[in-house]
Amino acid sequence: MSTTNIVCDGGDVDGCDGERSLDLLPAALLETIMTKLDVASLCSLASTCKTLRSCVTRVLTFTPNFHVFNVSLSMETVRPLLFPNQKLSSLKLDCGRLGNSAIDILVRPSLREISLQNCRDFSGDLISEIGRKCKDLRLLCLGSVAEKVGRTINRCALEDLLNGCSHLEVLALMFDLSLYLRPSDGRIFGLVSDKLTHLELGHISSRMMTQLLTSTETSRQDSNKPVTSTVLQNVQQLRLSVDCINDAVVKAISKSLTSLIDLDLRDAPIEDPRQVSDLTDSGLQEINQNGKLKHLSLIRSQEFHPTYFRRVSDQGMLFLADKCLGIKSICLGGFCRVTDAGFKTVLHSCANLSKFSVYHGYKLTDLVFHDILATTLSLSHVSLRLCHLLTDHAVQKLASNLDLENLDLRGCRNLRDEALKAISHLPKLKVLLLDGTDISDTGLSYLKEGVWGSLVSLSVRGCRNLTDKFMITLFDGSSKLALRELDLSNLHNLTDAAIFALAKSGAPITKLQLRECRLIGDSSVMALASTRVYEDECPGSSLCLLDLYDCGGITQLSFKWLKKPFFPRLKWLGITGSVNRDIVDALARRRPHLQVSCRGEELGNDGEDDWDSADIHQHTEAQEDELEQWILGDEGDVEMEDAEDESDED
């Protein structure tokens, strides 16, 4: 375990008064205080002096929680931190640098909660071992298992899991189950704990789910009388990605899951479904048979093919509204035939609605919101993405709802400055997403008069009329800002001057996206690297995500400013690999806990945007990543400098 000596009054920490003072305190007192800290903070303390390091070593043998999601730890790091602890009850870890060899370290009988993300290099052995060892498990979340070439999962592994973990209450398997199970294998979930209340599956065929829920068994009293299966009967929250949402699967879910409160269904067909295998008005009539549903999301994604729910009309919305009078949130994506009449019926019938989302509402117009004041609605989240017929008038009507906190208008290309004038008067607004709208610098200046001080997230990606002027106006340093996330991607008129204004303002931005801004260059990186958000912290301390992909002015000079000590909290970096591949690779090796993307991938959202854009932004202030500093130390500078020298020689 590497440590860092602290210099105190010109001497080593081992000889300073600070450590001698700590020695006077009872170790039990120090350890009791340390039990309130997370793993990153404990590792930070361990690197300061021998006394604290000794206490941390003992605390790590009995701390109940080990949660590290912002850094992918290596096997060499995980082993000494986890191995001595036989009382660990909750493990949450990013496994991006781990594989099957770590199973014995991670899986232990004491665990009641396991959440492992990025398990690409694990096979089904991980799932099987959890079932064999973790008999008291209550929560299990596994992401991306066996996605690496050569890894696989077999049916037996899932059987071991469901047979062994008989107390599971939450189960989330976020990978494609259809790759490893045949449609007839759906009944394997009949082994699941009857205590299960939350089920989330990354991908499963609708046929498999339908067969699971509609299977019958013979009554013991009457061998000829079929009895409906009680599989998943206590599930309250169900979130599925299926190959095709259809009437059969909706009917099976509605009739079998009598305790259901939350239902999220998403599909992404590779071709237009046939009528017999698609969702229709009749299918919507089956939803919420038991009247308990509070949250509903039905989304057809165009990820693979431009498909929509072409067999659902306004009549289907009428059926849905009639069955969902008590619903609190609804998200409808891909209902291309539904008109104002259908959407308006939902709005006016569901008096408790607080979240309303429509994606690809091609027939939705301003008339839906014309008389919204006549309702008793108190909407906090509204998402109207890719509703091309909406104009400023609709937003003006929506803005009469002063409880709005999250407003997503991405892709509403007919929205202009008058909409922003209305939005500026929303006192609780925290998230504003305006990608692809027709707003100008003048429109954004209206925000200065109202919501600007409380706004946490702003996105103006692809708003072609914008220039540096709006940035200079908004970031003039005249007010304290709450803004954490800013997306300025694909603004072709944006220059380094805009980023200078941002850096000078000292805004505590944690997520900054500048992708495809052709006039942004090295000067912007230098300005951001030199930013001091707080007086007592190091330069550039607030940024956790920086996306510079396809910024035309970025050269190898920027990489000198992407090294430590600059950007100490940075976790995600988007860059164009062709700038200089050797330097990009050297940076990735120098900062192994920094996820460097060179192929234009969207950073940091993990696909959440596909489910419900009203909830895609989680606003938490980033804390300085002392864990990474402790793990990495000062090694690796020479390697990157060598790559730079070789580049200079070329």
Descriptions of predicted regions:
Residues 1-308, 318-321, 329-331, 336-339, ...:
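N-terminal adaptor-interaction module of cullin-RING ubiquitin ligase components
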Residues 1-24, 146, 612, 618-650:
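CRL adaptor-proximal regions
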Residues 99, 122, 148, 179, ...:
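Leucine-rich repeat
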Residues 63, 88, 111, 137, ...:
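Conserved hydrophobic position(s) of the canonical leucine-rich repeat
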Residues 222-225, 454-455, 481-483, 531-554, ...:
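Leucine-rich repeat domain C-terminal region
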